[in-house]
Amino acid sequence: MMHILVSNDDGYQAPGILALAEALSEMARVTVVAPERDRSGASNSLTLDYPLRVHGTGPHRYRVEGTPTDCVHLAITGLLSEEPDMVVSGINAGANMGDDVLYSGTVAAATEGRFLGLPAIAISLNAFEPRHLATAARVAQLIVQRLSRDPLPSDTILNINVPDLPWHEVQGWEATRLGRRHRAEPVVRDEDPRGRAIYWIGPPGSEEDAGPGTDFYAVRNGYVSVTPIQVDLTRYTALDQVAGWVSGLGRPAEEGH
């Protein structure tokens, strides 16, 4: 039977990860290794300056005093006696579309699985207070079934965003690219009880590139967005221009001391 590692960034008690683990347990052996608290926005950060503590919360269930990336790294490289066959991260409360993927701990957990050589999926539901986790859980089951039967190229991470709708209202599936947001809103300044300035990170920018073909457009129109992403961030279309730009910087070895 397939063995799936489940993680997230909302914490081990979040409704989304509980729904995901339950759904995938119907088709695979599931091990959950997740942060002990909400680590949304942790991105791909690894904890390097202090040891990680792990606490068992039930059979094949662990909470980690660390980031989502810590959880997956720890699970695959030392915690588990048997390496899983796949990593599934989610179900996140709130979409991870466009630029969101650079900050998302949900996507980061999947990315770490891909770094370590495993098929990886990140699943998010387009609502901060989800009403239809069952829809996203069913999406997870179908995607896992399909991926196990028909693997994708080894450098591919699937970023799945699901509209917060009853299953019978979902319009279908769309392969999409990442959209883009406008610049983030300003930070919010406040004061602590002693009158010292404190700051809250402001909300993300509104949708900018959100037309047909994007993840934003698909979810807005009731479709499940399936975006293949990868770790390589190189902008290949700019390489020739940058090569010419760099050539104008000179050659230090020919300039002497």
Swiss-Prot record:
Q: What is its EC number?
A: 3.1.3.5
Q: Where in the cell is it found?
A: Cytoplasm
Cofactor(s), names only, from the UniProt record: a divalent metal cation
- List UniProt keywords, sorted A-Z: Cytoplasm, Hydrolase, Metal-binding, Nucleotide-binding
Instruction: Tell me, in one coarse class, where this protein mainly resides.
Output: cytoplasm
A Pfam family matched by this chain, by name?
A: SurE
Against SUPFAM superfamilies, the record matches this protein to: SurE-like
Enumerate the InterPro entries for this protein. Answer: SurE, SurE-like_Pase/nucleotidase, SurE-like_sf
GO CC annotations on file: cytoplasm
Q: Does the keyword Nucleus apply?
A: no
Where would you find the membrane-spanning parts of this chain?
none
State the reactions this protein catalyses.
Answer: a ribonucleoside 5'-phosphate + H2O = a ribonucleoside + phosphate
Give this protein's Gene Ontology molecular function annotations: 3'-nucleotidase activity; 5'-nucleotidase activity; exopolyphosphatase activity; metal ion binding; nucleotide binding
The record describes how the cofactor is bound as: Binds 1 divalent metal cation per subunit.
Q: Where does a divalent metal cation bind?
A: 9-10, 40, 92
Q: Which PANTHER family match?
A: 5'-NUCLEOTIDASE SURE, 5'_3'-NUCLEOTIDASE SURE
Give the protein family. Belongs to the SurE nucleotidase family.
Alphabetized HAMAP family for the sequence? SurE
Function, as annotated: Nucleotidase that shows phosphatase activity on nucleoside 5'-monophosphates.
Give the protein's recorded name: 5'-nucleotidase SurE
The organism named in the record is Alkalilimnicola ehrlichii (strain ATCC BAA-1101 / DSM 17681 / MLHE-1)
